[in-house]
Amino acid sequence: MLYQLYETQRALMAPFADFAEATAKLYKHPLSPFTHIPGAQRLAAAFELAHRLGMDYEKPEFNIKTVSSGGVEVAVQEQVAIDKPFCRLVRFKRFTDDAATLERMRAQPTVLVVAPLSGHHATLLRDTVRSLLQDHKVYITDWTDARMVPVEAGPFHLDDYVRYVQEFIRHIGADVHVISVCQPTVPVLAAVSLMASAGEPTPLSLTMMGGPIDARKSPTAVNNLAMNRSYEWFENNVIYRVPQNYPGAQRQVYPGFLQHTGFVAMNPDRHASSHYDYFLDLVRGDEDSAEAHRKFYDEYNAVLDLPAEYYLDTIKTVFQDFALVNGTWEVDGRLVRPQDIEDSALLTVEGELDDISGAGQTRAAHGLCTSIPATRQFHYDVPGAGHYGIFSGRRWRELVYPQVRDFIARFEKERMGDRAVTPAVKAQATRAVKKAKAIVPTVPPSTEVKAVTPAKKVRRTATRVAPAGAGVPVAAAAPRARKTARRTAIETNADDATTKG
């Protein structure tokens, strides 16, 4: 019933939002006589703010048309590699007539970005993709709004998410570097673990950013809500059926508008101040700041519904049972064993001020992946970065991306030196070794991350934590960045970043 009430309210607000937009133009258009009346600028600003507060936000576009590759502008085109009911695998294909540039781009690493299915669209990672395209061939998971998926397509569970990731990795090939941002760190680690257990080739590297691998560490408000409420509470209070005016009518979902309300409720003062600053920017005529506000909230306010089965599975598996770290998670009757991963390098990234995934939650992956050599495990704490700052905005571009780029390049270079060993031969050898050796016991959640951290106490600083015996650091530590203004808590400005991919 709540979903129907929301849709009714949205339909009633639409005419008022349109009226506010038209009135704002009336008071600010240079040819309008109302522009010259006293207070016209303030009236225009007030009506424009009212319009943005009442309007409906559609899914944005990636809108990455061209990027710079080695100083050469190349065209970028989105191509759908795989189209499934709940997700599209999108490739950002780069084109150029410059032979040298084309040859160089062909030799660049391939990256699969697994976007979160947690309320926002994959376009939230636009800045991530734009940066990666400078040095990589890029794919991304573009999750479908559940209200747009007909009931006939069937349910979508967390286990289905794991299968989707496996299918995408197999489609691209094992010579891929996987980057998971926030929520997908858990299913991605599960997907790769199951592939390793089956003797399949695994990705060259795994980069996990701000995800709840072990949600018990430094629990945040998000974690506490999931842990302190029962499974039945979520099932009875946040799951609703899609109204009849959508293709997915009668599908049970966790509505995006509820998730958005939760996002805003975490920092209400910050959002209120941001909107007031937007009003003042319009009054002053500061169009650059006003446009930055629009770009950010066009993305932030565009949300999608989550399949109910997937949402409830995530609550139980990740935040209540902690099945991954406890070694009890099974997918299709097979135990998820991160300790079986041997060939993939691992980089974890955490934000100093992350209020969604707390300190140590992502880093916990190192304590689970005990078969990855110490020299292939890395961790990076991003100074002054909140949750969104680790994958978007200035801190992502200046601090995090150089770390990720050099990490990928290091193990891509290692692959190039090992080309004589084909994936099939490596997989066959791996299966033979697994049959010959004893099963490695599951690592307890409390295990120290000795492969990643030195003996002294780890401090959350900008310096990358190098593994014991590591050689050249992944990337030089960047200077501590100044804290941004409250309106740019999530830095999503598509300013001067150029990409290729």
List the predicted regions and their residue ranges:
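Intrinsically disordered, polybasic Lys/Arg-rich low-complexity tracts
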Residues: E414-G501
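Catalytic histidine neighborhood in serine/cysteine hydrolases
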Residues: C369-H387
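Short beta-strand/loop motif that positions the catalytic acidic residue
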Residues: I341-E342, L347-E350, D354
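Alpha/beta-hydrolase-fold enzymes
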Residues: M1-A45, A174, A191-E309
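Short, surface-exposed "cap/lid" segments of acyl-processing enzymes
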Residues: E61-S68, V72-V149
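Conserved acidic catalytic loop of the alpha/beta-hydrolase fold
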Residues: M148-P150, D160-H177, L189-S193
